[in-house]
Each structure stands twice: as structure tokens, then as C-alpha cells.
């Protein structure tokens, strides 16, 4: 989120021999005004041969057409054969491009490259930071489901990872104090890591201090139980479940531990007199012991 809108950035490895042509295309697009961009776009759509040969060019033109102004980009050399291509665009809430003409500094993808290396170093497969409304939560879950379906992993493992992530994101949404306090004291985070054949699922969110003792008690009880005891605890909790957040949240925590087959590692860090920041991580192995 930036400048009253949102910055969308992608990065991917390309062959270094593609850099000159791709840079030329981007420079040509950025020299066009909005009317010229629409004209070129219509021309490319109307010429099937041109469209099939220049698919990447058509995609870039379409981005410029939809947002209304220039595309920011950078190329970082990785080695003699490969480069890292970074494409970035800042848009307002209506999807219209934002560009600060008074501060027209050359775009640099250095920070994106640092972020990519950090994600790779820590085996972070997916990360989300921001307010998790029910609608946003559904989008994060749908994106994760798509990413998991693309991976060559056992279906039963994929289903367990997905089910646990759904429970964890729903748990975050249940305790949300609202966007304003989250922006002041700590935004929710959801993260999926994959390391040594195991998935690690983590979330973080604000929770009111008045609820921390109850939550800690629930977590400690759940972590003291084995698989059979968790099933029995789930059955008993189900029989007394209500619509209260504490009740439904308890069911979700039990389900996470049961499906993961591992302990729920958690931490409660005081933020101020009103809130603490609650983080939880569980490991998902290929087999539940």
C-alpha cells in the first residue's frame, strides 16, 4: 500500500539475451500518451499475426492501457545468462495509475531483489500482511489453494495444509479489532513456509489483553493432548459449542492441532495496555503420527 493506492510488483528470472528487446518495448510504451496506447492496443488486437508474435508486448500494452500511464521496471543481472526482471505499477483504488512527476526518480528494483532473497533464504512460500476481512481472507485462501494445486505434492498433504490455513486465517479474522487499530499497533500476517519436505503455517494478529489468559489456557491444554485425546476433546467441545468467538475459535485451534499432528507453537507479546500480538505456528508433515 503506497501513496493512497497500491503498488503491484512482480519479479522473475529471464534470459539475459531478452533484456535489450524487452527494455526497448517498455521504453516505447512509456513514451506513448493514453490515446496512443489505446490506438496501439486496438491495432495489435486487430492483427492476429502481430498478437501471436508479440504476446508479451500485448500484455504490457494492456497494463499501460488499463492503468493510464507509465510502467516502472528494472533489470538486475544475476549472471552472464540470466537477469531478474522487475515490473512495478502503483494504482489508486480505482485501478488508475499513480505517478509522481515532481519526484521522477529512476525506478530501482533493488529492494524487491532483497525481499526475494530474504523469502528464498527463509523458505517462505507465501506471505500476506494486511487487514484480513472475510472477503480478503477468501482471496488469500483461493490464491493459496491455486498455488498448492500447482505443486507436485501428495493430495492428502495438500488438503491438510489448506484446511489448517483456512482455520488459521478464520481465527485471525474472528479476533480482528478493526483496520484502524491494526494499522496503529500491528497488522495481521499469514505465512506459509516449505522446508525439508514439511510445511510451516504461521499467522499473527492483535488480540485484546482481556482475552490472553483464556487463550493461553486453551493453547496449553491442546498442546498437552495426544492425537486420541484431541479427538475426544474436539467431540466434547463440539457438543457444547455456541456462536461465541471464544467457542468457535476453540474448535478451530483443536482442529489445527489434530490435522497437523504437531504442537501449536505460540507467543503473546504485549503491545500496550489494550492489545497483545499473538503469533501461532504449526508444522505439517507428510504423515500424521
Please identify what each model-predicted range represents.
Residues 1-102, 119-123, 141, 173-289:
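Conserved beta-strand-loop-beta-strand hairpin that lines the nucleotide-binding pocket
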Residues 144, 165-174:
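Amphipathic alpha-helical interaction surfaces in cytosolic regulatory modules
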Residues 155-159:
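Short, solvent-exposed positions on alpha-helices
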Amino acid at each position: 500500500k503506497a501513496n493512497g493506492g497500491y503498488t503491484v510488483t512482480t519479479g522473475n528470472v529471464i534470459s539475459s539475451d531478452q533484456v535489450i528487446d524487452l527494455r526497448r518495448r517498455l521504453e516505447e510504451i512509456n513514451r506513448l500518451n493514453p490515446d496512443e496506447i489505446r490506438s496501439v492496443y486496438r491495432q495489435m488486437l486487430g492483427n492476429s499475426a502481430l498478437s501471436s508474435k508479440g504476446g508479451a508486448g500485448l500484455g504490457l500494452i494492456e497494463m499501460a492501457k488499463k492503468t493510464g500511464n507509465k510502467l516502472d521496471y528494472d533489470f538486475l543481472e544475476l549472471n552472464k545468462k540470466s537477469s531478474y526482471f522487475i515490473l512495478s505499477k502503483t494504482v489508486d483504488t480505482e485501478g488508475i495509475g499513480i505517478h509522481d512527476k515532481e519526484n521522477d526518480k529512476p525506478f530501482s528494483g533493488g529492494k524487491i531483489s532483497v525481499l526475494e532473497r530474504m523469502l528464498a533464504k527463509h523458505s517462505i512460500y507465501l506471505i500476506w500482511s494486511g487487514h484480513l476481512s472475510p472477503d480478503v481472507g477468501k482471496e488469500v485462501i483461493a490464491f493459496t489453494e491455486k498455488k498448492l494445486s500447482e505443486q507436485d505434492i501428495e493430495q492428502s498433504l495438500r488438503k491438510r495444509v489448506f484446511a489448517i490455513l483456512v482455520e488459521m486465517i478464520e481465527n485471525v479474522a474472528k479476533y480482528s479489532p478493526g483496520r484502524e487499530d491494526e494499522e496503529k499497533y500491528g497488522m495481521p500476517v499469514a505465512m506459509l513456509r516449505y522446508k525439508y519436505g514439511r510445511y510451516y503455517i504461521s499467522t499473527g494478529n492483535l488480540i485484546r489483553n482481556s482475552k490472553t489468559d483464556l487463550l493461553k489456557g486453551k493453547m496449553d491444554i491442546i498442546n498437552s493432548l495426544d492425537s486420541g485425546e484431541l479427538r475426544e476433546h474436539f467431540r466434547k467441545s463440539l457438543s457444547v459449542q455456541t456462536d461465541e468467538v471464544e467457542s468457535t475459535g476453540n474448535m478451530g485451534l483443536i482442529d489445527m492441532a489434530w490435522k497437523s499432528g504437531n504442537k501449536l507453537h505460540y507467543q503473546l507479546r504485549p503491545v500496550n495496555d489494550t492489545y497483545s500480538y499473538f503469533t501461532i505456528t504449526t508444522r505439517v508433515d507428510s504423515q500424521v503420527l
